[in-house]
Amino acid sequence: MTDIMETRPPDSPSPELLEFLLPLHRSFEPRRRLLLEARLRSLREAEAGRLPGYLSGSEATDGTWRLSVPDWAQDQRNQITGPADNAKLLVAMCNTKDPGCMPDGEDSITCDWPNVRAAHRNTIAAIQGTLTFTDAAGKTAKIVPGKQVMFYRPRGLHLDEMNARPGETVSGSLFDLAAVFFGTAAERRAAVK
């Protein structure tokens, strides 16, 4: 009998992706756990009638906080979002005239292993401009090159991923981000040249 903890799920991450992910996981997991514990404490306090407020003296409340948005992300008046695991919808989203596109890896999909990995593959292929979809009639749709900015939305901080590495749970959000970031490294390098 095979120990289930040693069984690799289908579509397992490559050793290279794991080599990229695991140092990030080990670095950020303690902080993530602290944030999740703080979130639970805040929830308990809110349930007891003590609602949260802003930190006094915070730059966010005194009007001095500013964020510089790069030129390529300035025009975000209209952004389209949808499920990253659905190639047909993602191709359609990428082919709109909207300045922004957000493949959603959490709320728009069921976060089981096949859907999560499909979301990774589709998002990577969309960024690379190679994502296609062929319907039942044999008609193929592909991404038309454009200037649309893509913002991938990973799963939330509170969601774990148990299939990335046998016997070890990692942050779902960090795994999603690492998979897409790692899978599009060549495109990002080319963009800065």
Enumerate the language-model features and the residues they cover.
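Active-site-surrounding "flap" and adjacent substrate/cofactor-binding loops of secreted or lumenal enzymes
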Residues: W113, R117-T130
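Short amphipathic alpha-helical patches
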Residues: R44-P52, V116-R117
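Short loop/turn hinge sites at secondary-structure boundaries
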Residues: R39, A46-G49, G129
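Short, contiguous strand/loop micro-motifs
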Residues: Q76-N78
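Conserved alpha/beta-domain cores
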Residues: T2-S27, L34, G49-W65, P70, ...
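Long alpha-helical scaffolds
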Residues: D98-P99, A119
